[in-house]
Design a protein with these regions (language model features):
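Long, low-complexity, charged/polar intrinsically disordered regions in eukaryotic proteins
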Residues: 383-457
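Predominantly flavin-linked oxidoreductase catalytic cores and closely associated redox partners
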Residues: 94-239
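Long, charge-rich, low-complexity alpha-helical segments
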Residues: 123, 455-523
Length: 523
């Protein structure tokens, strides 16, 4: 993305591709990103298996159950199960095709600084060559190595997800029954959970996620293969699928993998992907977060290079947007862990969300998001298949009930006459901390100044049109709906006044149902 914007980009890659990497299961949210990168046609032609959803043994029912992307994502109803050596090679070649100077086998050993600003890097190649490169921005995409996070002491380990994974690749695994044969399969068992991901190579990626502290001794005193086999045998469905399978590659181990950096952008540098944060892999979020942060960090650097006046604000916008996405996946994973009450083992007991106020808060933004999901959305599946903490489930249902009450009230107020006279006399009042702010928003490959609507549940702000900005700015707790419509209707072309009023009234209804407009006085 940076190269497309005209920047000269040097990519120093430690490995030589293709190389092994875990994280094969993509999400539909990554499809538009791959399209924007220009690599989607190559991904579609690579032969990867189409992933329609997930099948799980989790929660109160020992029978496998499935959810499907099409239930919540009509535009992109599927993703892919990718073989990472091939998939990552496609991404690397796509970078080369767009003008990036890619140097494989080059490891960055040090970031260079001058007066607190990152000014370049020192590297060493696998042939022993060393060198330095001066640059205007350093993008740290070093993954869990976390070069800048280590240098600046930015990484904060997540106390909730203290897990590790042992995984390998099996041939001749039995697939799930149709129509779920290409789904990722996740099975909880007393000491953790297992993933099984079918691949177009004929292999299946299988991994066990276990508690780091309690598993270290067993792993260190035995073989990884015996450890993985001992976990698989505890999961009846997975062990049945692998009954005639053979381990072809691995096992491998990934340790200490849940963390977030307190700062992801600064003077002359930005962190992207796993270098910035990583969350438990339950919802296959790793590749999506990496791709998303690649787009956002490139936009930040482009903006900072074009206009230094926006650099600091764009850095804050990048951090808000990226960490909001990270936070959503984190809270969703925490909710799923806490909902699995089928076992009293240490693994699951240690990952329960307690009801007391000191250890469990409603996390209003996440509750709002979950409450807005269709009944079969995968965020909602935990409420049906597991046993979510009572306070959380109660909060979600309370939000849903309040939204429905508001919708009915709004429709009733509009149905009095054809002109909607009952609603015209109402006096709207904004919820506390609702504001229109000028902030950087994501444009075409860069951050640009724009207008956002900020609320308690969306403090980072939602980009809004001039009409919404004008409407919300006029809501003062004294003007009626009719007066507000007259004012915004007068701001545009007089011939469009009627259409503007109708659009503004519809927008006001959405704001009321959502709670941004807290009250409608006089109704």
């Amino acid at each position: 993305m940076l190269a497309r914007q005209g920047a000269s980009v040097l990519l120093l890659e430690r490995e030589r591709f293709p190389r092994e990497h875990v994280g094969e299961s993509l999400l539909p949210a990554s499809i538009p990103v791959l399209e924007e990168l220009g690599v989607l046609p190559a991904v579609q032609e690579a032969g990867f298996l189409t992933k329609w959803g997930a099948t799980m043994v989790w929660g109160s029912d020992p029978t496998p159950w499935s959810w499907y992307f099409r239930e919540t994502n009509q535009r992109n109803p599927h993703a892919y199960q990718v073989w990472r050596p091939q998939f990552d090679q496609l991404l690397l070649e796509n970078s080369r095709a767009h003008g990036v100077d890619v140097r494989e086998g080059h490891r960055v050993v040090e970031v260079l600084w001058e007066d607190g600003k990152a000014t370049g890097v020192r590297y060493q190649s696998d042939s022993g060559e060393t060198g330095t490169v001066q640059c205007r921005y350093v993008v740290d995409a070093s993954g869990q190595t976390g070069l800048l996070a280590r240098d600046l002491n930015l990484r904060q380990w997540d106390p909730f997800f203290q897990n590790l994974a042992v995984y390998g690749y099996f041939s001749s695994a039995q697939p799930l029954p149709e129509p779920d044969e290409t789904n990722i399969f996740i099975e909880a068992y007393p000491h953790g959970w297992l993933w099984s991901i079918p691949l177009h190579t004929g292999w299946t990626s299988v991994g066990a996620v276990v508690d780091s502290a309690t598993s270290q001794n067993e792993i260190s005193t035995g073989s990884l293969q015996r450890f993985l086999e001992s976990q698989i045998i505890q999961a009846p469905h997975t062990s049945r699928m692998l009954r005639n399978a053979h381990l072809e590659s691995g096992p491998f181990i990934v340790k200490d993998w849940s963390y977030v950096c307190e700062r992801v952008a600064g003077d002359g540098y930005v962190l992207a992907g796993d270098a910035a944060c990583f969350v438990d892999p339950l919802f296959s979020s790793g590749v999506h977060l990496a791709l998303m942060s690649g787009i956002l960090s490139a936009a930040y650097v482009t903006s900072a290079l074009k206009g230094p006046g926006i650099a600091e604000a764009a850095a804050a916008a990048y951090q808000e947007l990226y960490l909001k996405e990270y936070g959503h996946f984190r809270e969703m994973a925490r909710l799923f862990y806490s909902s699995n009450l089928t076992s009293g083992s240490y693994f699951w007991e240690a990952r329960r969300l307690l009801e007391d106020a000191g250890n469990f808060t409603p996390r209003q933004a996440f509750i709002q998001a979950v409450a807005g999901q269709p009944p079969r959305g995968y965020e909602r599946a935990v409420l049906e298949q597991g046993q979510a903490p009572l306070e959380f489930a109660s909060s979600v249902r309370q939000v849903e009930s309040e939204r429905e009450r508001r919708r009915v009230r709004w429709e009733a107020a509009r149905s009095g006459t054809d002109t909607g006279e009952p609603i015209l006399a109402a006096v709207p009042k904004l919820a506390p901390e609702t504001q229109i702010q000028r902030k950087p928003i994501l444009g075409a490959g860069e951050f640009v100044w724009g207008t956002v609507l900020t609320t308690i549940s969306q403090p980072e702000g939602t980009p809004c049109s001039g009409l919404i900005s004008a409407l919300v700015s006029q809501i003062d707790g004294a003007r009626t709906v009719g007066q507000l419509l007259d004012e915004v209707g007068s701001l545009g072309d007089p011939s469009q006044a009627s259409q503007i009023r109708q659009t503004a009234l519809a927008a006001l209804g959405i704001l009321y149902v959502d709670g941004t407009v807290e009250e409608l006085g006089g109704l």
